[in-house]
Structures are given as structure tokens and as C-alpha cells.
Amino acid sequence: MLLTQRTDHLTDHPGQISFPGGRAEDFDADAIATALREAHEEIGLETRFVDVLGELPTYTTGTGFIVTPVVGFVDPGFTVNADPFEVAEVFEVPLSFLMNPANHRRHAVELNGVRREFLSIPWEGVDAQGEPRRYFIWGATAAMLRNLYRFLVA
């Protein structure tokens, strides 16, 4: 699974782990067009390297964003070219790890007197320099991965 870490200076979700993607523009034909355009802008993924499988159900984040996850395979030959303004790092996590419910964690915190629950999928991987690194995949990204898991095992 191809994931990114957002740069720390972004207004929305700075420093968090996310999928390549972003806001729809008026000229985008649909969610797939948005996903492909944003993936190209953020990580240099050209559409010729993507075999789109389809969309997962829409997901609404705790902060009110409405996300339509688009799922596809990336063909061999793609070279990452990340936009340094938006993307601090691009990395991969094996799908087998992400789809193993033993790796899914539930958390609960209280913020301003309101109990909030969220999922995480901690991953111990290797960064672009080959150094060991811990990644904390959580919130909407972890929840959408959990939805993918539920979809695949149904």
C-alpha cells in the first residue's frame, strides 16, 4: 500500500500519514479523476501506471472531510517524484500487514470533555534512507484501511 507523510506546515492534518489524494476541483469528472490528478500532483504517479479497481464507500472524517477512497494497482516502472511542499515522505506498507486485524488498534481519548475513539495501525518500516522507522497510521487513514479489510473479507 502506497502511503505518504504530509509535511508539517500544511494547514490540514500536518505531519500525518495519508493516502495520496486531495480536494476535488470543478473540472474533475468524478472521484477517480480527482484521485488520479492528486496522486500525480503529490507523488508524480502518472495515470498510465495505475489500474483502477474502483471506489470504496464514502468516508466522513471527524473533522468533516468527505472522502471517496479510490483503489487501484500501481504497475511496475513508476518512480516517485514527491511534491516537497505537500509530501514529506512516500513509503509502502505490505497489504498483508494492513489487512491483518491483529495489527489494528483501538484508542479512546477525551478532548474538551468529549470522548473520541480512533483506530491506528502502527508500522515499523524503513525510510527512504534505509533506516528503521516507526510510522503511526491512524485516524481516517487507518479507518479507511479497516473498511478495505472489511470489504475484502466480506
Which functions belong to the PLM regions below?
Residues 141:
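NAD(P)-dependent dehydrogenases' Rossmann-like dinucleotide-binding region
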Residues 1-19:
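N-terminal strand-loop-strand
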Residues 9, 23-127, 131-137, 146-154:
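Unchanged
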